[in-house]
Design a protein with these regions (language model features):
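Hydrophobic alpha-helical transmembrane segments of multi-pass integral membrane proteins
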Residues: 7-14, 35-51, 123-128, 149-150, ...
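Transmembrane alpha-helices of multi-pass small-molecule transport proteins
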Residues: 31-79, 104-107, 157-164, 179-197, ...
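Specific transmembrane alpha-helical segments of multi-pass solute transporters/efflux pumps
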Residues: 55-94, 100, 136, 218-236
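C-terminal transmembrane-helix exit sites in multi-pass transporters
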Residues: 52, 102-125, 250-271
Length: 296
């Protein structure tokens, strides 16, 4: 019989496959990044609220001491999705996803700092290798330097969100945390777009299959996937979570190549750099697992 950890790990791989599909959806949907994220978070929060009202009204309850953390989580995840989809819009799926692969490295560095543990030597070694890969990607796709930089910042936000939620799920109901983070993120995003003077009816106007794609993005790839991803954090470490998320670029890039073919093809150096990033992250994870096994 597989252990609870193995079941949760397998489930999370499926969730990451859905996350990989969001990058494709982001490219398929015609509206810009901020309205897209508002639709995504707003509809996802609405779907969870409807589920609570019909089946579990008590799920609306959130302990007072978690409110400030949930508020911060909503800001971080909203900013992460806006920067991620913006990077896709200006640089393409492959470039945005290649930078998201650095999330495990960023977590390996930030987690010890935030949680007060010693930074391990092997994390620095594999981190340096990852930096070499990122350097190659920057050099190979210099014309997309803005998109690369924004996607890298998005990976940082994703890492911070994972570490923050890794703490909260130990004391809060995952689906409740999901709802309030999505709700906070959508409200704050709406306030920003209203007061920035950028709000127009046209920016929220959906064309052709946009409604269909946004529905999949909001309900399947967000309400469902977001809740499950937080739930498995009770059984998996922040580093393991980010290790699996590092496979998202592989899923997403394969999907984008299948859908758009040569449009998403990039230079040889890009793929060499991407391979170095993925390899160093996977080797880091394998090494960490071996070290943990030796302690038992």
């Amino acid at each position: 019989m597989p252990s609870d950890r193995s079941k949760n790990l397998l489930l999370f791989h499926f969730i990451v496959l859905l996350f990989g599909f969001t990058s494709v959806l982001g490219a398929l949907i015609s509206i810009s990044a901020l309205p897209l994220v508002l639709y995504r978070m707003g509809l996802a929060a609405f779907g969870l609220a409807l589920y609570f009202l019909v089946f579990h009204p008590n799920y609306f309850y959130l302990p007072k001491h978690l409110w400030s953390k949930v508020f911060l989580g909503g800001i971080i995840i909203g900013a992460h999705w806006v920067t991620f989809f913006y990077a896709i819009k200006i640089a393409g799926v492959s470039i945005a996803l290649s930078m998201m692969a650095t999330g495990a490295l960023i977590t390996a560095i930030l987690d010890p700092i935030i949680n007060g543990r010693k930074l391990l030597g092997y994390e620095l070694i594999f981190g340096s290798l990852t930096s070499v890969g990122i350097g190659l990607i920057y050099q190979a796709e210099f014309k997309h330097i803005e998109g690369i930089s924004i996607a890298l910042f998005s990976a940082l936000l994703s890492s911070l969100f994972t570490i923050l939620n890794g703490r909260m799920v130990k004391i809060g109901r995952p689906i409740t945390l999901s709802f309030y983070e999505l709700f906070v993120g959508s409200i704050l995003g709406l306030i920003i777009i209203l007061f920035s003077g950028q709000f127009t009816i046209e920016s929220f106007e959906l064309k052709d299959l946009d409604i269909f794609w946004i529905s999949i993005l909001a309900f399947l790839c967000t309400s469902f996937a977001f809740n499950i991803s937080i739930k498995v954090m009770r059984h998996l470490s922040s580093f393991t979570i980010m290790m699996v998320i590092s496979l998202e670029p592989i899923y997403g890039i394969i999907l984008s190549l299948l859908i758009w073919n040569e449009k998403e093809y990039l230079s040889l150096n890009f793929y060499v750099g991407f391979l170095i990033v993925i390899s160093s992250i996977l080797m880091s994870g394998i090494y960490k697992l071996k070290k943990e096994a030796q302690k038992k």
